[in-house]
Regions:
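Short, glycine/acidic-rich beta->alpha junctions
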Residues: 31, 89-90, 113-125, 192-193, ...
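Short strand->helix junction
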Residues: 104, 114-115, 419-420
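Long, hydrophobic, well-ordered secondary-structure blocks that form the structural core
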Residues: 108, 112-120, 241-242, 265
């Protein structure tokens, strides 16, 4: 019965979504007009003359691009209980995240925007079922490794992790078969929580597991160690792994080993600020994401190269080009206006609009003018691990600026699952692929400004130790792939000494 309902619902959703997929520019134009209309009587709208904005060009003249720190004065008013500041009324929630220079970020979630988060997660699964004809996951247990659903309250507004907020909106179709229990989900200590999740899930008919790869990996490894079996032996009905927030490629080899068999994966692009995309095709090795244009989000784009050099020229979706690295800018029904979320994307298709997430604008390495981005180091690692039959657990890249008796270079801190037989060959593979991808890096190597990169092995569990030491173990927290300073590198050296 559940399968029949899902099939009918999936076909209905497909027809609804096809309307905006077939008319993307029209939908974005209508979204723009709708957002401006709703924002006219807000404090932000009055300060930026929304009443007289009739076109996108006028909007760009009146509303600058802002990041969280620049929008903070408005958000603080909302946090303090004031209404009609960024969006009519007050938000339902604040998604609390870490990562700013002045403490936690509070991202508003309104009654309009929460619906788009939930609908997108639902649509991603329904699309998967319809495209693959695999409805078996519906007839089993589903595990979502996430933050605590216990929410704090401030000025009458609940706040917590986005994944914890979303736990209050699980569709009835999935609620009965959901794991872990509410009590276990509320455990704050991550390692204790994983142990409790294992107790609740081993022996159950698990068919869907979702979560950030690094933390699901920890969960899987503890099960394999405890049971002495592969994941597919422990969970023979498991047929779908859903992830978001990071590239799966660096984890693919180790997950294949843990699974012990091939398993379907579903890539998504959720964030506290909005749900931006999900994988809509399931050919081999295909993980491009359909950009969602029906979520009350108006998208703008700035070439990442321009942004890093101080030029903020932005365009709407009708002017984007393929294979250009863009910084993603959003205006939403949560009251974020031309907001820089920090993610960079590339378009792989414009009919329909599909993207890959190429990295974080703040997670780049350009200590020597090389402009290296996350996508490049992940691609280099993918190539090097395949060429050298290596599996890795985690890695990050940092600059070595003033070494003694040698040229500056990049240091790659790598936690290996299995070590290369020839470390110098592995290192050479990484360096060659970076040279192939990044012309600036090649010029610096050829010009003897930089020497070839160096690989530094991190002891087993080293990255988890690092994340624990900075209070970011578990949940939606991720290790940055690269940085322009040595904070992570030096900390890794200290705790792994």
């Amino acid at each position: 019965m559940k399968t029949i309902i899902a099939i009918l619902y999936a076909h209905l959703v497909k027809r609804q979504n096809q309307k905006w997929i077939d008319n993307p520019i029209k939908w974005q134009t209508n979204t723009f007009k709708k957002l401006i209309k709703n924002g006219i009587k807000t404090e932000f709208g009055k300060n930026h003359d929304f009443e007289n904005i009739k076109s996108y060009d006028q909007y760009k003249e009146k509303v600058p691009v802002r990041d969280y720190e620049e929008l903070r004065p408005y958000i603080e008013k909302v946090v303090n209980g004031e209404k009609d500041i960024l969006w009519p009324g007050k938000p339902l929630y604040f998604a609390k995240t870490s990562g700013t220079t002045s403490g936690a970020k509070y991202i508003p979630i309104t009654k309009e925007s929460i619906k788009t988060h939930i609908r997108s997660a639902r649509d991603a699964l329904l699309n998967y079922f319809l495209k693959t004809k695999n409805f078996k996951p519906l007839n089993g247990k589903h595990m979502f490794l996430q933050g605590s659903p216990e929410l704090d309250k401030k000025q009458g507004i609940y706040h917590g992790r986005l994944s914890g907020i979303s736990a209050h909106y699980v569709p009835k179709l999935f609620l009965r078969n959901r794991k872990p229990s509410w009590t276990t989900n509320c455990i704050e200590d991550w390692e204790e929580k994983v142990e409790a999740v294992i107790q609740e899930t081993v022996g159950e008919k698990m068919t869907i597991i979702a979560g950030i790869p690094s933390w699901v990996q920890m969960y899987f490894e503890k099960i394999v160690l405890k049971e002495g079996k592969t994941i597919s032996q422990v969970f023979p009905d498991l047929s779908l792994y859903v992830y978001g927030g990071v590239s799966y490629e660096p984890y693919r080899q180790i997950f294949d080993k843990l699974f012990g068999k091939s398993i379907d994966t579903l890539a998504t692009f959720p964030a506290s600020e909005g749900f931006f995309g999900y994988q809509d095709q399931f050919n081999k090795d295909y993980t491009d994401l359909l950009l969602l244009l029906n979520n009350d989000i108006f998208y703008e784009f700035i070439k990442a190269e321009d942004f890093l050099s101080g030029k903020y020229d932005r365009i709407s979706i009708k002017d984007v080009e393929l294979d250009v690295n863009y910084l993603l800018i959003i205006s939403t029904s949560a009251g974020l206006w031309s907001y820089n979320i920090g993610d960079t994307i590339k378009f792989t298709s414009i009919d329909p609009y599909r993207i890959i997430v190429s990295g974080r604008i703040k997670h780049f390495l350009s200590a020597f003018g090389e402009h290296v981005i996350s996508e490049e180091v992940e691609k280099a690692m993918e190539v090097a691990t395949k060429l050298n039959n290596v599996a890795i657990r985690e890695f990050t890249v940092a600059p070595k600026i003033n070494p003694i008796d040698m040229l500056p270079h990049h240091e790659w801190y790598v936690e290996f699952e299995n070590f290369p037989e020839d470390m110098s060959a592995f290192t050479k593979s990484l360096d060659n692929e970076m040279i192939n991808q990044n012309i600036y890096y090649k010029d610096l190597i050829d010009g003897k400004i930089l020497k070839s990169l160096e690989v530094i092995s991190v002891e087993r569990g080293g990255f988890n130790n690092y994340m624990k030491s900075v209070g970011r173990l578990g949940g939606q927290n991720k290790v940055p792939r690269l940085s322009n300073d040595r904070k992570i590198a030096d900390k890794l050296k200290t705790i792994n000494a």
